[in-house]
Amino acid sequence: MGNECFLTFTTTHLSEAEQKLALYRLQLVEPPKLPLEKKTNPDKDGPDIKPNLWMWVNPNMVYPPGKLEVAVKEEDQSALSAFQPALKEEEDSCSEASEVQQPLPPCRQKRKQRRSTVPLPLAPGRRAPLENPWRLPQAISPEGRLWSRPPLHYFHLIALALRNSPPCGLSVQQIYSFTREHFPFFRTAPEAWKNTVRHNLSFRDSFEKVPASRQGGASTGPRSCLWKLTEEGHRRFSKEARTLASTQLQSIQQCMSQPGVKPFLFDL
C-alpha cells in the first residue's frame, strides 16, 4: 500500500494484468527514504528538496468535481427525454389496468354477496330495529322453491309464536316448530338459528320462563318449562309492528308459507 504512493499514475483503472505488471516494476525500484535528502539546487530557483512526482499533481485537474461521469450528448439527451414521458404513460396505463377487477364466476359472486349481506351482531343490551336494510339471504325448499329470510329480528319471530299460542306458553321446541311452519326459510337454514332463539329468550324484560307443571301442561322431564311473553314484550312488539312500512309488510308476506294469515299474526 505504501509503495503505491510512489507510482507516477494510478492503476485502478487498468486491467488486472497491467496492475500486476505495475506492481512488479514497483518492486524493482527502491522507494526513497524518508525524510527526503536535501540536494543543492544550482539554479537556486526552487527548493533544495526533490519532491515526489505526486506532489506536483493537482487533484482537481486529475479528478475535477462533477466530471467523473461521461457527458451525455445533446441528441442522446433529447432521445432520453422523449422516451421518459412514454414510459410514464405506459406505467400509468398498467396501474389503471391492475385496478380493474376481473369478473368473478357466478358461483363466487353469489358466495361473496351472501357473506356481505350478513348483519353484524349487536352489542349486549341493544335491540335491533325491525327494519333490515340488507339484502335477505335465501334458502331452497325440498320442493325447489326459493325462500327468503323474513326481514324480522329474532325477538319478533319469538313474539309471533308466543302471541299466537295458548296462554300457558310454548316450549323451545314448539317455538322452533311455529317458526318453521310459517317461515319456510328456517326449514333448510343451518341449525345455528336455534341457538340465536335460545339466546334471545334470555331477555328478561320481554320473556319469562314458567314451570310446565304450574300451568297444568304435560311435563316431559323434571326441568321442562314453558316460555311466555311479558307485558313489556307485548307492548314492545305492538309498538314496533305499527311502525312497519308497507314495503316491509310485503317482504314479510312473501316469506310466509301462508301469506293470508299475516294480518292475524301481527294483529294488524
From Swiss-Prot:
Database matches in CDD domains: FH_FOXR (cd20036)
Q: State the PROSITE patterns in the record.
A: FORK_HEAD_3 (PS50039)
UniProt KW Transcription regulation keyword: yes
Q: Where is this region: Disordered?
A: 91-126
Write down a Pfam family by its short name. Answer: Forkhead
Which GO molecular function annotations are given, in alphabetical order?
A: DNA-binding transcription activator activity, RNA polymerase II-specific; DNA-binding transcription repressor activity, RNA polymerase II-specific; sequence-specific DNA binding
Regions recorded as binding DNA: 149-248
Mention one GO biological process in which this protein takes part, according to its record: brain development
Where is it made, tissue-wise?
Expressed in adult germ cells (at protein level). Expressed in heart, liver, lung and embryonic brain.
Q: Which InterPro entries match?
A: Fork_head_dom (IPR001766), FOX_transcription_regulators (IPR052328), WH-like_DNA-bd_sf (IPR036388), WH_DNA-bd_sf (IPR036390)
Subcellular localization is given as: Nucleus; Cytoplasm; Cytoplasm, Perinuclear region
Is RNA-binding found in the keyword set? Answer: no
GO cellular component assignments: cytoplasm; nucleus; perinuclear region of cytoplasm
**Phenotype upon loss of function:** Reduced survival with the majority of mutants dying during embryonic development and only 23.5% of mutants living to postnatal day 21. Surviving newborns are smaller and lighter than their wild-type littermates. Newborn brains display decreased cortical thickness and enlarged ventricles.
Q: Which SMART domains match?
A: FH
Which protein is depicted?
Answer: Forkhead box protein R1
Q: Which organism is it from?
A: Mus musculus
Lineage of the source organism?
Answer: Eukaryota, Metazoa, Chordata, Craniata, Vertebrata
Q: Which gene encodes it?
A: Foxr1
